[in-house]
């Protein structure tokens, strides 16, 4: 079973904002694929690369995911080895789920991952974060 990662998308206001960032050349590697560079390399790499995704927490709510294609080594200008999480282009919207702030990324068990939204809902506008949070808090979403 694939193992997922979960990560806060700091400074992002919504799914469309994250998507726009991933189209910016600064968020892409030489191959044109979006990536997220982090200091920590997943020790459970084989499980993550067996179909895992990164679930994005935007303003306190898990709202979307991206499939992880590979992990690339990146050496920063400071000589420190980092991990570039190379992502499949395009975001897959998920059911929203509240998530408290945390640092870095965490493993996410597939049983705890919010389900993808059905095809009928994928192109719908996201609810405002405050409304989504309020609905999630009372268990509506």
Q: Which residues does each PLM region occupy?
A:
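A generic structural signal for short beta-strands and their flanking turns/coil linkers
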Residues: 4, 50, 81-83
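Aromatic- and Lys/Arg-enriched surface recognition patch
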Residues: 67-114
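Well-ordered alpha/beta subsegment
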Residues: 104-109, 115-141
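Short, extreme N-terminal leader segments that mark the start of a protein/domain
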Residues: 1-20
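Intrinsically disordered, low-complexity regulatory segments
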Residues: 2-3, 20-23, 27-28, 96, ...
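Positively charged, polar, low-complexity stretches
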Residues: 18, 30, 35, 45, ...
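Short, well-structured hydrophobic secondary-structure segments
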Residues: 24-65
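Amphipathic alpha-helical interface surfaces
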Residues: 18, 51, 64-70, 127, ...
């Amino acid at each position: 079973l694939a193992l997922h990662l979960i990560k806060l998308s700091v400074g992002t206001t919504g799914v469309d904002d994250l998507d726009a960032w991933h189209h910016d050349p600064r968020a892409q590697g030489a191959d044109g694929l979006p990536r997220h560079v982090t200091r920590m390399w997943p020790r459970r790499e084989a499980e993550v690369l067996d179909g895992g995704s990164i679930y994005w927490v935007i303003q306190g709510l898990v709202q979307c995911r991206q499939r992880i294609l590979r992990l690339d080594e990146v050496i920063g200008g400071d000589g420190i080895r980092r991990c570039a999480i190379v992502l499949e282009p395009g975001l897959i919207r998920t059911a929203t789920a509240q998530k408290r702030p945390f640092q870095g990324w965490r493993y996410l068990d597939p049983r705890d991952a919010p389900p993808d939204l059905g095809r009928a809902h994928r192109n719908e506008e996201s609810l405002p974060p405050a409304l989504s949070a309020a609905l999630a808090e009372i268990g509506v979403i």
